[in-house]
């Protein structure tokens, strides 16, 4: 132990666990910001149902967690509140060697080349949805983003193609994934699902399971399994060093996990991007130009759209923290923390740091163009061995969907106040659903041709020099 280490927990508010739980549920990032202002970059909360939680906003301390021994820093244990939905073999809930081996087995569908093959289907899904948007009328775009991201998962991840089953999945999955606090209680305590008070939730899970097991059975029986590119097909084919493949239950758990981890999270990121762009006319104009360039095959267009996505996820993180439960005493941020404590890298606090991001409240995608991002200072997907498996997929999906929106419709800008982040389950959503207005449709063929003739992209003209952003 270092001679500068302190025994015990860092300081924190002395409020009761139930009061702190209410503050976290209702005020989330505002409460954490107030604690950081009073106690510094490391502080302790005692939240009912979670015990002691040590929050970290210093990148050096976060590096200790992300680079630490996975057998000491348990992320699966920290995610146990989702056990009733995800299942015991979910990648989010397992730890140690079991997690390492399962993640290795599941990685191929999320490699860059495999993800790139899904860009075309994602664009088609987005274009079909955009074609039905209302004109000259304000509407909440968040539900539209959820429709797009759900369809992307159903068709590219699950690989569903049967019209009847697809229709059933479109109906059942949103009902299952959009549960309230009462249902969340049963998901954290699976034994409650047998209680009649939660019978409706149990039936929703059973309906979803029946559809997913049917897809798994179809994939196993498909004579063209080897040629399929959907994620489920690749998971069915995957085998470990001993030739063992995943069981039906294991496959089911991973599909539900991918739905939970990749549906509302990406939809919310896209919603925030549109909420931010429509309040920044100059940036919106540059993004439209980048979308046209991207559609014409100009890599600079992709780069600027990626910068929009990265800056959105910085300034409006969808998830504002990630947790690890300590299995033994360990030194973090100058404190010798005991086993059982949850250490929590505070994504939202890091992303709002003026030391790391000058003028952090300014939405400025240019700061991300050509930037080298540190894994402990830009961390919307978590970090270390538990970094989101689908991070590359999510970034490609955000880029492609933004491109299709901006090249197909003209969005009105607004001077109304920005929407407030509101906690929905474990994600931060725009409190009014990210309301936008479509002024007109755009001639896709004309814009693509103009770009191909040399209109170019703002990123290609030096949106910013290559530099390190948020690095230590």
UniProtKB/Swiss-Prot annotation:
Pfam families tied to this protein: p450
Oxidoreductase is among the record's keywords: yes
Cofactor or coenzyme needed: heme
UniProt cross-references to PROSITE patterns, sorted A to Z: CYTOCHROME_P450
Region (Disordered): 442-472
Name of the protein: Putative cytochrome P450 135B1
Biased composition regions of type Low complexity, renumbered to the chain: 452-472
Keyword hit for Oxidoreductase: yes
InterPro entries on file: Cyt_P450, Cyt_P450_CS, Cyt_P450_E_grp-I, Cyt_P450_sf, Cytochrome_P450_monoxygenase
Binding site for heme: 388
Recorded name of the encoding gene: cyp135B1
Residue ranges of the TM segments: none
EC number: 1.14.-.-
Keywords: Heme, Iron, Metal-binding, Monooxygenase, Oxidoreductase
GO terms for cellular component: cytosol
Recorded family membership: Belongs to the cytochrome P450 family.
Single GO molecular function: oxidoreductase activity, acting on paired donors, with incorporation or reduction of molecular oxygen
């Amino acid at each position: 132990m270092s001679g500068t280490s302190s025994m015990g927990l860092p300081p924190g508010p002395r409020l009761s666990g139930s009061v702190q739980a209410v503050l976290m549920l209702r005020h989330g990032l505002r409460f954490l910001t107030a604690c950081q202002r009073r106690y510094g970059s490391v502080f302790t909360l005692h939240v009912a149902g979670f015990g002691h939680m040590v929050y970290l906003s210093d990148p050096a301390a976060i590096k200790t967690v992300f680079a630490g021994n996975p057998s000491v820093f348990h992320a699966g244990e920290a995610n146990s509140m989702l056990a009733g939905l995800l299942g015991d073999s979910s990648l989010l809930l397992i730890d140690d060697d079991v997690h390492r081996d399962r993640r290795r087995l599941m990685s191929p569908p999320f490699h860059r080349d495999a993800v790139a093959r899904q860009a075309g289907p994602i664009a088609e899904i987005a274009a079909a949805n955009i074609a039905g948007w209302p004109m000259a009328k304000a509407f909440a775009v968040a539900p539209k983003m959820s429709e797009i991201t759900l369809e992307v998962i159903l068709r590219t991840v699950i690989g569903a193609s049967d019209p009847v089953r697809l229709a059933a999945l479109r109906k059942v999955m949103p009902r299952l994934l959009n549960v309230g606090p009462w249902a969340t209680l049963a998901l954290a305590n699976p034994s409650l699902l047998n209680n009649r008070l939660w019978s409706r939730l149990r039936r929703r899970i059973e309906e979803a399971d029946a559809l997913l097991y049917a897809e798994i059975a179809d994939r196993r029986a498909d004579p063209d399994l080897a040629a399929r590119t959907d994620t489920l097909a690749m998971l069915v084919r995957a085998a470990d060093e001993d030739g063992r493949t995943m069981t039906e239950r294991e496959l089911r758990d991973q599909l539900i996990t991918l739905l939970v981890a990749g549906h509302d999270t990406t939809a919310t990121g896209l919603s925030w991007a549109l909420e931010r762009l429509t309040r920044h006319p100059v940036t919106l104009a540059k993004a439209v130009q980048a979308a046209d360039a991207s559609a014409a095959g100009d890599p600079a267009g992709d780069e600027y759209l990626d910068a929009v996505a990265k800056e959105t996820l910085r300034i409006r993180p969808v998830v504002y923290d990630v947790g690890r439960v300590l299995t033994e005493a360990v030194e973090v941020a100058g404190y010798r923390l005991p086993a059982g404590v949850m250490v929590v890298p505070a994504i939202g606090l890091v992303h709002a740091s003026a030391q790391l991001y000058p003028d952090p409240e300014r939405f400025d995608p240019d700061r991300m163009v050509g930037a080298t991002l540190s894994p402990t200072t830009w961390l919307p997907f978590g970090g270390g061995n538990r970094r989101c498996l689908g991070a590359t997929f999510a970034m490609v999906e955000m880029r492609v969907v933004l491109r299709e929106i901006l090249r197909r419709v003209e969005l009105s800008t607004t001077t109304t106040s920005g929407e407030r982040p509101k906690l929905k389950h474990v994600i931060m959503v725009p409190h009014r659903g990210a309301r936008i207005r479509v002024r007109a449709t755009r001639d896709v063929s004309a814009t693509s041709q103009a770009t191909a003739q040399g209109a170019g992209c703002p990123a290609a003209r030096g949106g910013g020099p290559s530099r390190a952003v948020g690095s230590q």
